[in-house]
């Protein structure tokens, strides 16, 4: 994170001229978004606990939810993979893998990037959030969405072929 955050999150290519790379965690209502502007802030956010809460320019004494932390971790993985062709051995971008046992709305098979976009909507309280199981039922709850993003984060942790969950749920 320390080495690559500024480069991978520098969307306009001019950070040397004053642009600050950011990773934004949406929050609904009047709370306002949490904006992480450095690798140090990302690491502090991910390490925050009840005993050591997170503070920066956008929040003070904040305890991130597990879903918010999982969202940040998956965002880092997808962004680093897209930015650095050597991030993984695969030629397929992480964000473009399909999450085959889930749907957006009733028919669309989401990619990992789509799951991130839906997670943003969920965190922001956006009524267009529509991620669900392919087998039917309502939209995923906070707990179900957290578990999905956690599984995505763990999918290739320590295994070049993916976890058992990844092998059953991810495809091209």
Language-model features, listed with the residues they occupy:
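Soluble extracellular-acting proteins and domains
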Residues: 1-172
